[in-house]
């Protein structure tokens, strides 16, 4: 069993904003690793495709090895299990 503290930060991120960046930065002070999960909801009208969002976020964090990005279309709990996250990172809105 790993002791690494991994958090999933899930959202549509359409677009990924400076507010989202701030949450990730603060999350990195708490967690060893953060997985940014780009959720896909076919019923939502999106400005960018999921692939474009994933690509843009990966580019933004290319120099930060503790941040990774995934796309998911399942329940957040299932996505957390898939990426090994035991914590969810959320902001207040």
At which residue positions do the language-model features occur?
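Nucleotidyltransferase catalytic core that binds NTPs
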Residues: 1-93
């Amino acid at each position: 069993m790993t002791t690494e503290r991994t958090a999933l930060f899930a959202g549509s991120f359409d677009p990924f904003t400076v507010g989202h960046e701030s949450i990730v930065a603060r999350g990195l002070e708490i967690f060893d690793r953060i997985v940014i999960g780009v959720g896909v909801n076919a019923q939502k009208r999106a400005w960018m495709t999921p692939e474009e969002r994933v690509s843009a976020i990966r580019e933004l964090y290319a120099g930060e090895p503790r941040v990774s990005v995934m796309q998911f279309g399942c329940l957040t709990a299932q996505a957390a299990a898939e990426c090994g996250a035991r914590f969810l990172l959320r902001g207040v809105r």
